[in-house]
Amino acid sequence: MAGKKITRKQLLKEPDEFITTTGRVVRFLQENRRPVTLYGIIVLAVLAAGFLAYSYFRWEEGKALTIQQQALQLFQEASAGAENPDKQKESFQKAKEKFQEAYKVYGRGTVGQISQIYIGNCHYALKEWDAAIQAYAQCLDGPFRAVAAQSMGYGYEAKGEFAKALEHFQRNADGEAGAYQEEGLLGVARCYEALNQKPKALETYQKALAKNPKSNMVDFLQWKVSELKG
């Protein structure tokens, strides 16, 4: 298809329009030099502040990770020190304080949630059930929601609040197949037993067995089914 013919008059007119438009822009900048300069400075300041904030957050995150590593070392030492209960308790206390320090430095994102989970683990090891539950609750909406729900279930179970424990175990029991689903089902079954609801406990153990036929818990599950059937 042939292109549209452009007249000589149009060719002569277009440079004039460009020059006129350019002139208007130049005049605007000249007449509004101070506001334009001010707006430019503001934009640069905002960009610089954003870059500095990003750099600072990255530095905070790195510092928190370093503290986390120290805390994890203490936590592992405490977990392996069951032969000396007093020393173990002291180590869990130190680990908890380190994780709290890491969270204070950087409490956002995955790094912050890892700190919270381990703060909860330390409280749990120290039998500080309410504090453990509170820490785990901070992670129910994040990437570690399955860990948090299961851990809250254990916390309420340790307190003897089986209805609340069952509610949190149920989150994982209703989830996708995997380790947390099996743990969730086992937790639900234990809670039904504790609440003297044996038919529901039996049904849950049977469900766990059906969903995880190759689990290393098969012998235990078969025994529980046999026991509850009487």
Summary of predicted features, one role per range:
Residues 2-41:
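N-terminal positive-inside, membrane-proximal cytosolic segments immediately preceding the first
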Residues 102-112, 126, 139-147, 174-181, ...:
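Short solvent-exposed coil/turn linkers within tandem alpha-helical repeat scaffolds
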